[in-house]
Regions:
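Gram-positive cell-envelope targeting signals
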Residues: 1-58, 236, 321
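Penicillin-recognizing serine hydrolase domain
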Residues: 71-94, 196-352
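Short, flexible coil/linker elements and helix-boundary hinge sites characteristic
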Residues: 36, 178, 342-346
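Active-site-adjacent loops and short helices of periplasmic peptidoglycan-processing enzymes
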Residues: 55, 59-234, 243-244, 311
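Compositionally biased, intrinsically disordered low-complexity regions
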Residues: 19, 31, 38-43, 99, ...
Length: 352
């Protein structure tokens, strides 16, 4: 009887031991499988799977947002005075003006450069920047509508010449906006990018904020007068400097002429001529080469001009606002580069 009891106890212990051993083996198998899965294949595949299957945590969301919102400004030149900065000679026209070294931002000469003024069509340089940075394909087309033309005609704004119903490419619109200062072209590009002028203007102001511009505010994409549409000569120089760093913007601002092929609405096609290079060649002064820029005018702003030029291997930016006439703006631009950058003389207009 005792032997029978001992035999049963041994069997019970054997069963318990077998169960424990089986459980240990099962746990070990799970651990091994998990370890094997974690190390089979390369790490890139695991990471890729994780990005697809793991929902973002708060930290990951913040990282993603910071990457998306990282400023696209590679380098913003902020005009600043130094001990060598001079006052712009009073003989040069313009209520506000600044000449800067485009590479360092150092002000060579200035006058009321931080004082608020109206930018007129110099506005379109910021319009150009925002458009180019948000357009993926310049061959996309935009239909010119009555609503794009009528308001601009009503205020006698400059037009590129597109007709209602035409479908120019974005490239054609941007050339029309820069070279001819075409208001309808600016409005069409803005509507393509943002759906409306109002939304696009918000993007312009956001861009100004990104660039650290504290004295610039826009209310329209064209440069029409509005008391809340303003900038400074210094901040307009910063905007032009930014545009110059974008190859597309620089190409547009440096263009002399651009031709649009004939259409049913414009059977002879369109030829856009630069309002800047239509008044100067750019190489009138020894050692100075004006490379590009933009002009503007409203009754309230008077004549405005901003240019970039190369002198002895250095690039400079000059902004003059509030000039008496368009020719004063041109002649003084040539003179300032010559005198202040090349050590030359003032420009002497040819006798009529």
């Amino acid at each position: 009887m005792n032997h029978e009891r001992e035999r049963r106890v041994r069997i019970r212990y054997l069963r318990v031991g077998a169960a424990v051993l089986l459980l240990v083996l099962m746990v070990a198998g799970v651990v091994f499988a998990a370890y094997g899965c974690g190390n089979s294949g390369d790490e890139d595949n695991v990471t890729a799977d994780a990005e697809v299957t793991i929902p973002p945590t708060e930290a990951l969301t913040e990282l993603t947002e910071s990457e998306v919102q990282e400023p696209v400004v590679p380098f913003v030149v902020y005009p600043h005075r130094s001990e060598s900065s001079a006052e712009l000679d009073k003989k040069y026209s313009g209520k506000n003006g600044v000449l800067i070294n485009a590479e360092t931002g150092e002000i060579v000469a200035g006058r009321n450069e931080d004082k608020q003024c109206y930018p007129a069509s110099l506005t379109k340089v910021m319009t150009l920047i925002v458009a180019v940075e948000n357009i993926k394909d310049l061959s996309d087309t935009v239909e010119i509508t009555y609503d794009m033309l009528a308001p601009m005609i009503a205020v006698d704004a400059s037009l590129a010449g597109f007709a209602e119903g035409e479908k120019p490419t974005l490239e054609q619109l941007l050339y029309g906006m820069v070279l001819e200062s075409g208001a309808e072209a600016a409005l069409a590009a803005a509507c393509y990018v943002a759906g409306s002028e109002t939304s696009f203007v918000e993007m312009m102001n956001e861009k100004a904020e990104q660039m650290g511009l504290t004295k610039t505010h826009f209310t329209n994409v064209v440069g029409l007068h509005d008391k809340n549409h303003y900038s400074t000569a210094a901040e307009m120089a910063a905007i032009l400097s930014y545009a110059m760093q974008n190859d597309t913007c620089r190409k547009l601002l440096s263009a002399v002429e651009y031709k649009v092929p004939p259409t049913k609405k414009n059977p002879e096609g369109l030829t856009f001529a630069s309002t800047l290079f239509g008044r100067m060649y750019g190489d009138e002064m020894p050692g100075v080469k004006v490379l590009g820029g933009k002009t503007g005018y409203t009754d309230e702003a008077d004549n405005c001009i901003e240019t970039f030029a190369e002198v002895n291997g250095t690039t400079y930016i000059l902004v003059l606002c509030g000039c008496n006439t368009r020719w004063d703006a041109i002649y003084d631009t040539l003179s300032v580069y010559s005198v202040c950058c090349a050590g030359g003389k003032d420009y002497e207009p040819p006798e009529k």
